[in-house]
Amino acid sequence: MAWTQHRRGTDILTEGFVFALHGRMFGDVWSWAGSTRKTGKNIGIDPAQIHVQLGGLLRNARYWVERDSFASDEIAVRLHHGLVAIHPFPNGNGRHARLIADLLITELGGAPFSWGGQTLCDIGALRAGYVAALRAGDRHDFAPLLAFARS
């Protein structure tokens, strides 16, 4: 997304940026892009809690960055996991969370993640590995998601 390269001075750890990014990514596809979901899903939190939980996640991420609480890769991966867990949008949550993680790791001086790259021919196996890594994150084990992000 070319416009993300011209965002100097933009704080990505804000709700405004989170929603604007989703709108920019998917605005040509879905009229509701950049708006929170209004219904429950089999993944994610209650829609009424999205802003509360998202605000907490972004404050935590800012704290992790300011205090060097974790290595840069882990901060970005934890942010990614939290965004997917909250699931603020009806669709596009994973792609959106991966881009935000890439933007954050780049801002922290690292290289963007490969997120499994193109090495697996079977997209089903790639997705299964990604979902398994996210589930490990649900148990506070971020090693599989870190490994997947850099694979």
Give the residues covered by each predicted segment.
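FIC/Doc superfamily catalytic core
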Residues: 1-151
